[in-house]
Amino acid sequence: MSKNERRTFLLDFEKPLWELEARIEQIRHLAEENNVDVSEQIAQLESRAQNLRQEIFSSLTPSQRLQLARHPRRPSTLDYIQSIADEWFELHGDRGGYDDPALVGGVARLGGRPVVILGHQKGRDTKDNVARNFGMPAPGGYRKAIRLMEHANQFSMPILTFIDTPGAWAGVDAEKLGQGEAIAFNLRQMFSFDVPIICTVIGEGGSGGALGIGVGDKLMMLEHAVYTVATPEACAAILWKDAKKSSQAAVALKITAKDLKELGIIDTIIPEPSGAAHVNPLEAAAILKETLVNNLEELSNLTPEERKTLRYEKFRQIGVFLESDSNLALHS
């Protein structure tokens, strides 16, 4: 991401760091123009910037992580595919007359291994987001996804899914076309597949829209991704009749990778580059690729029956809670 883009999409909590980095660049430029050696001062300022970056990103609130997950320049499914896949051939259509641009997928080669990759796809600007329906798939998108996954299962190719959606499309037409049935069918079928399945939340994992491609042997999240039953804004509006309490809802919902790892819902937190994935997309992709390759190798050592049994047990263990604790979280 260029400096101008970063400044355009600067988040409030990033401003102190941006101002310090801009000051460093200004001093460096003036020193070069006047042939003055300020290397010692620059080193001190860069050390301060590094410490400030560490301080900011080690103490992010759930709401701030949500801002990072929704960042307009955060790498998307297609961005990651283009960076990690040795070969990639996109497949289209649900064979029912619909090709949903909000959910993309195809055949790829990862680390020398043929795989099927699919995921939600948001847009880069307003026009692109409208075309992609802001990453909210219609029923045809989930039917396209299951078609590709059945293809993968038939030809013994592992399945990799990238989750990045505020939720499935909730329009009247989506309900008429069977949104609930399409997602439910995917859930059932994904439990039955023989091949390894790895699901990764790369940005925003929202509600049933995320679950529709979220059943796997491994569920992973990027460090600053979020995964939630409902957006904090929607949760606040429902519980407190006030969307402005979204920050409070974000805490209660336990949406961060750290929270979900502690709750046993996800298996792995994938670290992001300093400053988050949008600052250095290539490094983020390299870390993601290494993690996927290693986990695929591990899962390939299991038999299909072992994988399906562990997959079933993994999801059966999700959802145990104490009512008193949940009430405390809602009223705190």
Curated annotation (Swiss-Prot):
Domain of life assignment: Bacteria
First-listed, main subcellular location of the protein, grouped into a coarse class: cytoplasm
Metal-binding among keywords: no
GO cellular component: acetyl-CoA carboxylase complex
Keywords associated with the record: ATP-binding, Cytoplasm, Fatty acid biosynthesis, Fatty acid metabolism, Lipid biosynthesis, Lipid metabolism, Nucleotide-binding, Transferase
Pathway(s) of this molecule: Lipid metabolism; malonyl-CoA biosynthesis; malonyl-CoA from acetyl-CoA: step 1/1
GO biological process: fatty acid biosynthetic process; malonyl-CoA biosynthetic process
The protein's Enzyme Commission number: 2.1.3.15
Enzyme class: transferase
SUPFAM superfamilies associated with the record: ClpP/crotonase
UniProt GO molecular function: acetyl-CoA carboxylase activity; ATP binding; carboxyl- or carbamoyltransferase activity
Catalysed transformations (reactions): N(6)-carboxybiotinyl-L-lysyl-[protein] + acetyl-CoA = N(6)-biotinyl-L-lysyl-[protein] + malonyl-CoA
Localization (cell): Cytoplasm
Assigned protein family: Belongs to the AccA family.
Protein name: Acetyl-coenzyme A carboxylase carboxyl transferase subunit alpha
Species name: Crocosphaera subtropica (strain ATCC 51142 / BH68)
